[in-house]
Every structure is written in structure tokens, then in C-alpha cells.
Amino acid sequence: MSAGPHRTVTELPVAEGWDFGDFPYGLEPLTLPEPPHEPAADVPDVLCAEPAPGGARTSCPRTGPAPGLPELAHQLFWFRWITGHQLTFAIWQLLGHALHQAHARPDPGPSLRAMTDLTRAYTAMLLYTGSCPKDVYSDVIRPSMFLQHRGFSGTWAPDFVPVRRLLRGRKTPWHETPEGGRLADEVRLYHLVHSGVAAKLVPGGRSLLQDTAPTARPHDPRMQALVYDNYFLTLRADVPTAEVVEQLRRRLAAVRLDVSVNGLYPGL
């Protein structure tokens, strides 16, 4: 664990067992800097990772054993909901930096390729957070958001703001280039997955925000951001990009342990 005043947890979980949170499928707080609304000179280039040695990839079983008790299912899918969203916030931060760097570089290609990979990673997190059965979502997750705020909405996510236009499919300056075309394809895939997850979890199609009278909605964006961060155990402090990446890697290792045992859809 970092010895600095922000107390970020960056060590990777051990490979031979669970080492995230205080118990299997426990949670940890995430510490992020403020969202990257502007280019930051002190942020390293966001580039694609080197391929794994030998091209090896970790498999993700589609299914696995069902949790034996409702309490175990609630714990597992609560972990996925919170930790998967925390991963998404870190991905959005890196995506925002890569977007700024693409605008600033004479050759935006490396940044666009990184943005394509990050968009695919975000889509994977949608599948992960949305893997819970409908009854767990309706009985546990949706009520927890309602208790946090009656109009709780994903549109309040602070880290989404810098990448909102990109992820909503607006044209970029590079849409006619090969790299820009591949990025646009990934954004379209994200929209398909997002629509599918929403249709599965909320068959009626109405969010908490849509079900709430306007008088119950916070009108101050700062309050919205605080409420949203608080729900997902996310703190804000001036932490370097390297610590953001290490916190992301720590959570990815925990997710990998989870799906290797339980599959993406346990008991399906």
C-alpha cells in the first residue's frame, strides 16, 4: 500500500489466491485525480500495451457454478457492480488523456489505437458490471442507488464528461482515417452492448432519473459528482497517472480471478 497521504492501494492481488479487499469479493476505495478536461503536460503518452509473450490470453469462461446462497450472489455481483465501475472510471481517465494527446500530436495514430483498445476495455466492463441476474439488480443494486439519491444517474459520472462526445458517436477529426474508422467501430460496438445490458437489467427502459420528479434532482453538477463518487467508493486527490494505472491493474487482476472461477455468468 502506498505510504503517501492519499493511501492508495496499488499492489497486485497474488496469483494463487484472493487478495483484494479484506475478504473474497470485498471492496476497496479508488483514488483518482480530477477528470482530464484539459491536456496535462505531466501525463505520459497513453499507448497500446505490448502484446503478451507468445500471444497468450487469459480465457474468460462464459459460465461457472451458481452461488450457493442468495447472500453469496449478492456479495459477488455487488463486487462486480462497484469494482467494474471503478475500472470504468480509470479507463475513462486514460481515454480522456489519449484523446487530448491525439489532438496535440502531429501523428495521432498511436493515440487513436490506444483509444480503440480503451473503448473495447470499457465495453468489456459493461458486460462485467451487467452480468448480474435481473433479480439481483432489481432487489439489491437498483434500490441501493435509489437510497443514495432518488434520481441517481450514470450521467453524473465526472470522468465521463471529457469523453462524452467521443462515446456518443460524434464525428472526430480522424473519422476518415483507418485508425479513426476502427475507433468508430468500437464506439458502435459499445452502443450495442450498452443497449443490450440496459434492456436486460431494466426491461421497462426507465432509469431512476426518468422516474424522479424534477424537484428531486440535484441541480448542482458538483453535488451530482460527489454523490456519484461517494456511491462508488471513489475519492479525488492529486495522485499521479502511474498510481491510477496501478489501481486499474490491481482491479483487473481481481476481476480475472473472479471470472476464472465463476465465469462471466455464474449458474447460467
Each model region followed by its residue ranges:
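Surface-exposed peri-terminal alpha-helical interaction modules
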Residues: 1-268
